[in-house]
Design a protein with these regions (language model features):
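Periplasm-facing N-terminal accessory domains of Gram-negative outer-membrane beta-barrel systems
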Residues: 2-150, 224-226
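Periplasmic N-terminal accessory/gating domains of Gram-negative outer-membrane beta-barrel systems
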Residues: 95-256, 271-275, 281-292, 299-308, ...
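Transmembrane beta-barrel strands of outer-membrane/channel proteins
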Residues: 131, 265-271, 319-323, 436-440, ...
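Solvent-exposed loop/turn elements at secondary-structure boundaries
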Residues: 164, 177, 504, 510-513, ...
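Residues on the lipid-exposed face of transmembrane beta-strands in outer-membrane beta-barrel proteins
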Residues: 193, 252, 304-308, 422-426, ...
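Outer-membrane beta-barrel channels and translocator barrels
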Residues: 198, 228, 255-257, 299, ...
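Periplasmic-side early beta-strands and strand-to-turn transitions of outer-membrane beta-barrels
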Residues: 264-417, 442-462, 497
Length: 783
């Protein structure tokens, strides 16, 4: 039988386990993925193990030195090393020293440096060999399936833009149609890794989470390829130290300074002059093919960076900036049947559809609506709809038939961005090393209205467009302490922040600016966006619009905390770790407080009841006369204050059973309670609360009969305790077993067999919870 802990009980249990782990922190390891480990063996010429040999791992570039001693079987492990290029040397009394150079360690890697064969001789004599990079890339100390994109590949592999996530398409098991040509925060949700859902991945920069907790598909910040040392993607069979998400694990490591100064300056340019026009755009105007110009497609990227020592072997810095000036096509040809200049004022004399007067059932004389014949209320609607229709672009095509488009365009939006990155590394003393890294993004995009965008959607093109301000930053702070040569502690903190605000410019979307005052169910201020109009009928490609979500904003802050220790005991690397994340997400609802009208041609056609005549009437005429098919308006736009706490911990052992066989086994525990609203605004339909005796009655057309019952029958609320705080119960602490192995089939370290098994849990995207506040309670809960 499976039982779920209540939220309250799970909280208490989690707290007790946190205290236990803190007290027993002597056997824990780094749970994040910025560090790696180097394994190896030391033997003599006869193949016998050499115990108590001294192994020294150094990185002259960043002044790192680590010394370990071999165990009874001549093996050694050096954990918690920063990614980089190392020199590994082994020495013992009575033997020549052996030194292996160019040992490249990657993030989250368990690198086998191979066997160090010591020859009898004086300690002052040494043998130096260069590591085989190809051989070292074989993963023989873990069952994980992962792929590394090294710094060299980052430089050598051409991209369609500057999006580092575009490299994921090179990895086996990753499927995506991601277009990484533009620099944008969209992308992590565009990949399926080994069949997992696209929004179930974790993406970290130097161990700090970089995923928006609303859709789990966008990132807080971007970082350009020149600022990255390497990128690693774990696709399956990863160890218990990796969690938070059920899909792939993407780990990006930023560049750091070194004992030498390095830098670069770069410029990238792209122009639509090298592109062919859209074939459909060439054919859009039958009278003059090719008259619809190509969309502007221009990239001008300028960047620079510099890194070096503040004090050699002690402190280093890395600083870089990249400026993006982008004009990005909105996505193909946009064409529709826009109202002509005459139609906007009620003159349909040039329109190939007969317009009927709904009051008389007869055609209007000359196919013209005379506004002077309307009463005051009708005239008010006529004048306001006329103003709204005048906001659409005028025709620029000659339609080939009555039902063809008379307007076509290809638009681009402006998206200037700036990336800043600063990293500081500091060797405090022999036992403590610290680094801090800050990435800052500044962005303000301006979109034309005639585009599919987050909040300015549709085919009204107003001066100034729609503007999105999106500042964001991501920080990583990390301290590694060497307690003993085999016992290390690492603590890290990673806050990440993003803000977004959408809206028009200078009131261009507002009813006040445009002088529109159509009837509303609920009063609205002059700053409210213009009403949305949905036109239908005549088999015409009518334009549409949606501005009800303006102005819109969201603010997402996550804070990660990790405290981990590594303990190496003979041929075991025992690992236990702790991960905690706090998320805040403040977001205003989408909505239609501006009012949404739907209009068709029926009222002004020859058959207003059956609406069988598509060759008469027109939606524009029906709107001018105030014949709306439906109207919908929200009374308010609530703001959600969504929060969650997430705690995960694990125990794991990497056991080098034989020189050729490694076993990974461990258990991770995840406490992932649902997001909740801090104002207790969540409402859901709960079948347990439904009373059939008080249910509303429905007529033959499916409409609710007024005053026939309780409209809120079955609705539960987190505010009054009829629902759990997050809408549904927490599943408590969930176990996630992990098992993996790696076996070298041959002694030449050229063929490795790996396998593994594991379970993971994932937090559902926040939007599923947000809708319980933003929408009418149509969602169903099964507590």
């Amino acid at each position: 039988m499976v039982s779920f802990l209540s939220l309250k009980k799970a909280t208490l249990t989690g707290a007790l386990l946190l205290i236990f782990l803190t007290c027993c922190g002597g056997i824990a390891l780094l749970a994040q993925i910025t560090s790696g480990a180097i394994f190896g063996e030391v033997r003599d010429q006869s193949g016998a193990y050499i115990s108590k040999a001294t192994v020294t791992i150094t990185s002259p570039a960043i002044g790192v030195t680590r010394t370990v001693v071999t165990g009874d079987r001549g093996d050694f492990i050096a954990p918690n090393l920063l990614p980089g290029t190392y020199t590994v040397s082994a020495e013992a009394s009575g033997f020549r020293k052996v030194e292996k150079t160019n040992v490249i360690l990657s993030a989250a890697d368990r690198l086998d440096a191979g066997v160090f064969v010591l020859q009898v001789g004086a300690a002052t004599q040494s043998v130096t060999v260069t590591a085989d990079a190809g051989e070292l890339q074989l993963q023989s100390n873990s069952g994980e399936r992962s792929d590394l994109i090294s710094g060299k590949q980052l430089n050598d592999v051409a991209l369609n833009g500057r999006m580092v996530l575009d490299y994921m398409r090179l990895i086996p098991g990753v499927v995506s149609d991601f277009d990484g040509s533009a620099s944008t925060t969209y992308g992590i949700g565009a990949f399926n890794v080994n069949g997992t859902r696209a929004n179930t991945h974790e993406y970290t920069i130097d161990g700090s989470s970089n995923v928006d907790t609303g859709d789990n598909a966008t990132t807080h910040v971007t970082i350009n390829p020149d600022a990255i040392a390497e990128m690693k993607v774990l696709t399956s069979n990863y160890q218990a130290e990796f969690g938070k998400a059920g899909g792939g694990q993407v780990a990006v490591v930023s560049k750091s300074g070194s004992n030498e100064f390095h830098g670069n300056v770069r410029f990238f340019h792209r122009n639509e002059g090298m592109n062919a026009n859209n074939w459909f755009a060439d054919q859009a105007n039958a009278a003059t093919p090719g008259s619809v110009p190509i969309a502007l497609y221009r990239y001008n990227y300028i960047g620079y960076q510099v890194g070096g020592p503040i004090k050699k072997n002690k402190a280093y810095f890395f600083w870089g900036q990249e400026y993006y000036r982008q004009l990005i096509p909105t996505g193909g040809l946009d064409q529709f049947r826009t109202p002509t200049a005459l139609e906007r004022v009620g003159d349909f004399s040039q329109t190939p559809f007969t317009i009927y007067n709904p009051a008389t059932g007869l055609p209007f004389p000359g196919n013209k609506i005379d506004p002077s014949t309307l009463n005051a209320a009708q005239r008010n609607v006529f004048d306001n709809v006329s103003k709204l229709l005048s906001l659409y672009s005028l025709p620029n095509l000659t339609p080939a038939s009555a039902t063809d488009s008379n307007f076509a365009t290809q638009l681009s939006y402006s998206d200037p961005r700036r990336e800043d990155i600063l990293r500081l590394d500091y060797q405090i003393n022999e036992r403590n090393r610290f680094f801090g890294r800050w990435v800052n993004n500044a962005e303000q995009s301006t979109s034309p209205m005639q585009t599919w965008n987050l909040n300015c959607m549709g085919q009204l093109q107003l001066p100034g467009g729609c503007v999105n301000n999106a500042p964001s930053w991501n920080l990583a702070l990390d301290l590694v302490t060497t307690i003993t040569p085999t016992l290390l502690n690492e603590v890290s903190v990673g806050p990440s922040v993003t803000r977004s605000s959408w809206g028009g410019t200078n009131g261009n979307l507002s009813i006040g600016k445009n002088g529109i005052s159509l009837p509303m169910l609920y009063p609205v201020p002059p700053s409210t966006s213009i009403p949305d109009m949905g036109f239908n009928g005549n088999n015409l490609p009518y334009p549409w619009s949606y501005f009800g979500a303006n102005p819109w904003f969201q603010a997402n802050t996550t804070i990660d905390f990790n405290d981990n220790v590594t303990w190496v005991k003979n041929n075991h690397a025992l690992k236990f770790g702790l991960f905690y994340q706090r998320s805040r997400k403040d977001q205003i609802a989408w909505g239609n407080s501006n009012g949404q009208y739907t209009i068709d041609n029926c009222a002004t056609s020859s058959d207003p009841v059956g609406c069988t005549d598509n060759n008469s009437g027109m939606a524009y005429a029906s709107a001018l006369l105030g014949y709306f098919r439906s109207f919908d308006q929200s009374s308010s736009r609530p703001i959600g204050y969504f929060r969650y706490n997430q705690l995960e911990f694990y125990g794991q052992d990497t056991w080098k059973i034989t020189p050729r066989l490694t076993l990974d086994y461990g258990m991770r525990f995840a406490w992932i309670p649902p997001q909740y609203d801090a104002k207790n605004q969540i409402a859901l339909f709960n079948p347990a609360l439904y009373d059939a005796a008080t249910a509303v009655k429905i007529d033959a057309d499916g409409n609710i009969i007024p005053n026939s019952g309780n409209l809120l029958d079955g609705i539960g609320y987190s505010k009054n305790g009829t629902l759990p705080k997050g809408g549904w119960k927490s599943r408590g602490i969930m176990p996630e077993p992990r098992l993996g192995f790696a076996y070298e089939l041959t002694q030449d370290h050229k063929t490795v067999l790996r396998g593994g098994f594991g379970t993971s849990h994932d937090r559902e995207q926040g939007n599923l919870v947000f809708n319980t506040v933003f929408q009418n309670p149509i969602n169903v809960v099964t507590p």
